[in-house]
Amino acid sequence: MTDPLELLLFTTDVEFAQAAERAGIDGLIVDWESKGKNERQRGHDMETNADTADDVVRIATAVSCPVIVRVNGMGPHTPNEIELALDCGARGLILPMSMTAADVSRFLDLVDSRARTIVQVETQALVEELDALVKLDWDAVYIGLHDLMLSRGAQSMWQAVLDGTVEHVFRTLHERRVGFAGATVVGGGHPIRFTQILQELSRLGASLTFLRRSFKREIQDRDMAAEINSIQAAWAASNARGPDAVHTDQQALYTELQRFIGV
């Protein structure tokens, strides 16, 4: 039987968080990452949040599912951010923008098994240290396509899929919990249909993904629990495909990505 796809949602809206928990979302992310983010993402359609410690407390006291805090990238501030997040009720921590496996190792030492650890692989420098990263005792990895695009000077976030970088991460971190891209309602997704992304997540052996920022908009006037169930049903169907269907679906996705990028 296929394990469900772990779905994590960014929100500081208590009512939405409670509805998401009832619908079957696995965890809620409060986003503290802000240092240097506006500068590196200027000119790109990317989201920058300004969540606070109070947001963590409000969400953590309103739900029973895990609340996860994305702290800033490793720096002198990291020990204090980790302690504050834990004091506020965080049960998981996400480290973004690591440049080295040593950064990740330091982060893990600071957390000291007190919370789940998710490492974002979103710099070319860390991609080049995967052999060291796989030896560390983190809980999950999420490939951040947007910042990886900026790190590599690429024209599209999808180039890392087309050129095999994403597959290389999955294969190197084989049998660990890894995810990328984003989920939304079945039938949604632009410019690439979500079901195509879901099929690629399945092909690569993904375990988790984040809900897209468009999810809250696309879920309007829909039954959230029914939509989450539809995602999991589509996930199970993706995992039930035979080798020929997997290959055909991959080729269709890559053709669509090439058309979108213009290569």
Regions found by a protein language model. Give the residues of each.
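Conserved N-terminal beta1-alpha1 strand-loop-helix module at the mouth
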Residues: 1-65, 74-76, 256-263
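Hydrophobic faces of well-ordered beta-strands that scaffold small-molecule active sites
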Residues: 5-11, 28-30, 67-71, 93-95, ...
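Active-site pocket-lining/capping segments in soluble small-molecule metabolic enzymes
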Residues: 31, 36-42, 149, 161, ...
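Catalytic cores of alpha/beta
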Residues: 14-22, 76-88, 103, 124-137, ...
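A structural motif corresponding to the C-terminal end of an alpha-helix
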Residues: 58-66, 169-178, 204
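Glycine/small-residue-rich loop that forms an oxyanion/phosphate-binding "nest" at active or ligand-binding sites
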Residues: 65-96
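Active-site-adjacent beta->alpha loops and helix N-cap segments on the catalytic face
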Residues: 36-59, 75-79, 96-115, 125-131, ...
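Glycine-enriched alpha-helix->loop->beta-strand junction motifs that scaffold or abut catalytic
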Residues: 23-28, 86-92, 111-117, 135-142, ...
